[in-house]
């Protein structure tokens, strides 16, 4: 009798949990939470979770909690595919997120399309499919974006060079990074620069000296790198060990602010679209408070991207009528404007034709030896995102 009562109680508990789950907005995430790429992606998800917990603590969205289901793919395509299948078929998520290397995109996109569920790239590089004319199901809020970043970086190089530019290139051997550095090489020629060497390293390389050696031998006065941070910074450090004294511009990933302070090299420039904590905008205090309560192990300077992702999720769900379906969420995402409160140069805006943003704003920072601090050397420069 006791055994039967226990089974009945468990069944009631299971039913109650299921009912509660149906009352939540269920969002699925496949992310590189472990493995070599985790330092770039895990902080995004941890900060996003902290933001969602903060929202839930205030009553959720439209009176309903947001449930995040996060699965680790270790930046492996096969794991990302399995995660996407489970989240879509078993958990019935109304939105799927990818925060991993671009090598995981193809299987994730395929599963999302098959299930007709919107796919949101958060913390992972924005694929061109999110640019106008956008793929109907793919969206991205991540700071960095193919082609536009190289346009902004090389414009800065040109504006800050009195001598002829001899440009070296460095990238990781992953699809989007390789394509972007090839694009930048072609773009440099149209700007009157001379591309002198391009080095592509495996993900990750145990030693970057061979790649740096080839770059140094070509005698560039600038090097541009656009890849995961490990590739960017280790190539730079290897060049410095070899005695190269030129200027190096690279993408401002999550850890760039801390790394500028560690390296203290005035000729290392980082280009980005998220305000650094050194910029001290008011919402930085909220990020500190929310992520402190969540006891996140990463430095607060790593967490802006994830906070933005949480803001985007909240805004999309607020515009989604209850009960949520993937189609309702998609309709909300197709007409979305998110006030980022100074974390970027303007709001993030998606339209039916543009799932990236309508404007991309860039700043550039470096270490100032005289001030013994990180300083901004270029304020927000806007690039219109068009067809």
Predicted regions and their residues:
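Immediate post-signal peptide segment of exported/extracytoplasmic ligand-binding proteins
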Residues: 18-29, 60-65, 158-165
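Segments of small-molecule ligand-sensing domains
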Residues: 293-303, 314-374
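Hydrophobic alpha-helical segments within soluble ligand-binding/sensing domains
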Residues: 80, 127, 141-166, 206-209, ...
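Extracytoplasmic ligand/sensor domains, especially the bilobed periplasmic-binding protein
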Residues: 93-198, 245-264
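Beta-alpha junction/loop-to-helix N-cap segments that form part of ligand/metal-binding clefts
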Residues: 24-26, 39-46, 58-131, 201-208, ...
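Short, low-complexity disordered leader/linker segments with a strong preference
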Residues: 1-26, 385-387
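Extracytoplasmic "Venus flytrap"
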Residues: 25-49, 71-78, 100-101, 170-179, ...
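Extracellular/periplasmic periplasmic-binding protein-like sensory domains
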Residues: 143, 236-307, 379-385
